[in-house]
Amino acid sequence: MQPPRILFIPEVREDGTSDRSPAVLRLLRKRHEVITFPSPRDRLIYDTSRARAPRYALYAVDRLLAAVQGVRLGRKTHIELTFCETPHHALVGLWISRILGVPSVWDSHGNAAVAARSTGKGRVYTFLASALDRFLGRRVDALITVSKADAEAYEAMGVPPDRLHVIPTSVNVEEVEREAGQAVPRGTEAAKTLIFFGSYKYTPNLEALRFISARLAPYLEKEGIVCQILVAGRDLPRMDLHPSIQPVGFVEDIHALIRSADLCVVPIWSGVGILTKVVDTMATGTPLVMSRPATMGIPEIQDGVHALVATSPDRFPELVADALRNPEKMHEIAGNARRLVEARYDWRIQEPLLEDLLTKLTTGAGGSRHRGG
């Protein structure tokens, strides 16, 4: 039997990173013919520097146009399933699936209600985002979540449990090892190297960068700890940073850069789902100091076993200083973290779960299609 032909929404940049959307797309391409559906107007719609009313109007028009174009493309290419990466694109995918009579899959990166509360969004935003999540969750044929906690949050919204499937954000450990190669920490006894990385359009990452500059770096300086803090990733803002911080921008071989650091820091205090940067760092075997919220989605992480975990912003700089002063202890902790990723968060473990789900949906074994809710 031929594997199902998939319409993947939206088209994403396949840049070799461990980010969930391109990673999932690469997995799907291994066994399926995948047609990607571009969403060129997203750049304007989600540009918060632009006026709100025109963006909202464009959003409504764009969803309608995308649905029409998607149906045409789906008919032309004979798709057998839609696979969508955000709630806004899942809305389009659901319409396409209903019209063409094919199953719809939504790969949720985090529950909207939990995310809104975590990031301090207003009541109106929280209500609308939660309503869209609930609407989609009750109507798509399968809702993939990145963690059990997210699945439970959707179930509390009224999403039927049989539509929920937990497939954690993972990494390809073999690829990580190949990319990281023989990189060794570039720091010395006199000056250590720290790293933080991510996309700075994501508000929690931007807040983390400010925290590193305003609180972590000055604390280490006061303690007499000499270090350089590498800051990598897309969309680095123009802002005054502590002199010990060295912006390096987007790095293609990020795993080699992570392994070359003595310590990775993740002071994320809001957000949902599994942070790719955490799994990436654990896979490289680089020691990690992280905030308690950054452990969300990876319940196996234990403080002092897989990482040093700060329960408050005040505690975070203290743990970083402790980690830098105890490299042998951190080396052991990093080894535990890598073994956890190898056992639970390698895509080779998750890929069969994804394939099994798609097979059941397209052969009718996954339940009746187009159920209302």
How would you label these PLM feature ranges?
Residues 149, 167-170:
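Carbohydrate-associated surface elements
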Residues 155, 170-190, 364:
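Acidic anion/phosphate-binding donor-loop and adjacent secondary structure
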Residues 1-43:
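N-terminal subdomain of nucleotide-sugar transferases
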Residues 329-344, 350-353:
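A short, well-ordered alpha-helix in the C-terminal region of glycosyltransferases
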Residues 277, 287-292:
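Short hydrophobic beta-strand element within catalytic cores of glycosyltransferases
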Residues 64, 68-75, 91, 95-99, ...:
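Membrane-proximal helix-turn-helix segments that form the acceptor-binding/catalytic region
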Residues 17-27, 173-175, 187-247, 251-254, ...:
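Conserved catalytic-core segment of nucleotide-activated headgroup transferases in glycan assembly
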